[in-house]
């Protein structure tokens, strides 16, 4: 009986210390993090654009898009019955106030189907494959503080043997988002 009580107190002590020691780390992380939603204000073009990641490109004729967006079904919704398996571009401008210069700035993507290249102010900063997995890109050193920044994402919905296609579109009760 004494051993059982002693074991109980050891487990209780260990769990208490684990919880107690994790609070300062969680509190500091919660105070430091600022999350901005960038799902609105995107311009979208279905098809390849040679300079899609460059700031000087005129995208005023592109379609307004809110993320998540279904690039593959645009054609179907416009009267066709073929799912688009090609390339598309998304572009958006944003500003970061200089008050955040001492912070780490990251962009989190919840998933891009199937593969993508991410550009900031005309420079390719990352690439990702695998539409079902999110990823994070650190943009801290590439920010134009207190000025417009152009974020451009080239998305490829082309067949990729590394990304499972799921089931046929006709049998789905959901959509793949780009």
Predicted regions and their residues:
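Accessory beta-strand-rich segments of carbohydrate-active enzymes
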Residues: 36-38, 45-48, 85-178
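N-terminal secretory signal peptides that target proteins for export/translocation
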Residues: 1-9
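Hydrophobic alpha-helical context, especially transmembrane and signal-peptide helices
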Residues: 13, 31-32, 77-79, 102, ...
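Short intrinsically disordered, low-complexity coil segments enriched in acidic
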Residues: 2, 20-23, 178
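Accessory carbohydrate-binding/adhesion or oligomerization-edge regions at the termini
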Residues: 24-81, 150, 154-163, 167-169
């Amino acid at each position: 009986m004494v051993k059982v009580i002693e074991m109980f107190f050891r487990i209780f002590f260990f769990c208490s210390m684990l919880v107690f020691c994790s609070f300062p780390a969680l509190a500091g992380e919660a105070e430091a993090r600022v999350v901005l939603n960038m799902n609105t204000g995107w311009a979208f073009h279905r098809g390849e654009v040679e300079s899609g990641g460059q700031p000087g490109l005129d995208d005023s004729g592109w379609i307004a898009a809110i993320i998540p967006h279904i690039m593959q079904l645009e054609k179907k919704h416009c009267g066709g019955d073929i799912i688009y398996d090609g390339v598309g571009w998304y572009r958006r401008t944003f500003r970061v106030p200089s008050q955040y210069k001492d912070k780490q700035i990251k962009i989190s993507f919840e998933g891009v189907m199937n593969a993508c290249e991410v550009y900031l102010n005309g420079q390719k900063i990352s690439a990702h494959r695998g539409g079902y997995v999110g990823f994070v890109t650190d943009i801290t050193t590439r920010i134009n503080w207190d000025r417009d920044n152009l974020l451009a994402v080239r998305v490829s919905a082309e067949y990729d043997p590394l990304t499972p296609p799921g089931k046929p579109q006709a049998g789905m009760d959901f959509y793949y988002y780009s």
